[in-house]
Amino acid sequence: MKCFIGGFMPIITTQDFTEEGRLQIGTFAPDIGQPAENVLVRISYSGDDEILEEMITDASGQTPVINLPAPPIEYSMELTETRPYSDYDIQVIMDGYRPMIIQGVQILPETTAFQDIRLQPENNNSVGERIVSISDHTLWGTFPPKTPEAEVKELPPSTGYVVLPNPVIPEFIIVHDGRPNDASAPNYWVPFAEYIKNVASCEIYANWPQSTITANVLAILSFTLNRVYTEWYRGQGFDFTITSSTAYDHAFSYGRNIFEEISTVVDDIFTSFITRPGIRQPLLTQYCDGKNVICPNWMTQWGSKTLGDQGYSAIDILKSFYGYDIYLMQAQRVQGVPVSFPGTPLQTGSTSEYVRIIQEQLNAISNKYPAINKVRVDGVFGPETRRAVETFQEIFRLSADGIVGFNTWYRISHIYVAVTRIAELS
């Protein structure tokens, strides 16, 4: 949420790319429930036809992780007039599907970027290349500042929509890709955690301290869940959850790459939000960059980075900006998953009905992701189950420890739902 006040912002040239970031591409047809194998992937500098890398996706729809040139890390540690990331174009080609180009994939030094691509079948209504252009990062580009709002909303009167007594994590966020009254802007249905990862990748740099990333993710979560809980836009007659306009909400760039350093944090805490004593709803935790826009009593992104550098924890960073009476809560219900996390990690030696559930789900997922071995469904967490969990974690970019904790449980649930939906459609 920022607005650059100033003149020309120079773009660093490729000769100055003295460091590296990493990139992995995942391809799906049409979504994560169906990986796309043998897709031709080409990478070039943005606006340049010269191909830097050419790869083929594996049975999980993924390319190897590759290193790509990036600017010096100093440019993302302090506000400068030089863009702190390099950008690339990705072209994907697969028989029977529309060729696709992702323009402006952002690579930060000392980070790993993930670019997932959803392919569309060729038909009479969709021909030619499909192009997705990623917006500038908000800390470097020009964006309107946030219009201030009250952090606690009056709940709307009953209009047919049910305001739940306690915050719930929705399965999807409906993002209006523009200002609220722009009827020409499309709406996108985005899985909740995927939406949070997209926003955070737009709003902060992934090579910042982990406590800074966590604090900013918590603010994004709380803001978003306030919009969900209060039915803010539906109460005004709109058919979406939130917008992509920084004047009203967060930045969101459809189809953009996310970063591993942000993704890991989101997977660990996506049910958490910020609140105050005596308040049931998540706070509308507004923020700005703190350099080009000043926002008293809100978190500043660059200020949170400074505190992270000084060793502050995520909650102490948040309290420094929003007040020392704030605290964290967790939503107890996640929509769209068959069974909630049991509360205790499952690992070698565990025996329970929850182990049986994970075994059944992993077997279903392995029908589409054959690198995952089949397991006996017996409720006993043995070596076969551990190996299947580790392979799942490797494919879906989680720490491959073979333990089904909070993040792995919900990731397995999410992929299981996607895979079974594809099977039903088939």
Task: Give residue spans per PLM region.
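Short, ordered coil/turn segments that flank beta-strands lining enzyme active or ligand-binding pockets
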Residues: 31, 46-47, 59, 95
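Structural motif
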Residues: 13-14, 18-37, 45-46
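A short, solvent-exposed beta-strand micro-motif common in secreted/extracellular proteins
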Residues: 73-96
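Short loop/turn motifs at secondary-structure junctions and domain boundaries
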Residues: 46-49, 82
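Short coil/turn motifs at beta-sheet boundaries
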Residues: 18, 34, 83-85, 110
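Conserved, single-site charged/polar hotspot
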Residues: 3-10, 14-16, 38-42, 56, ...
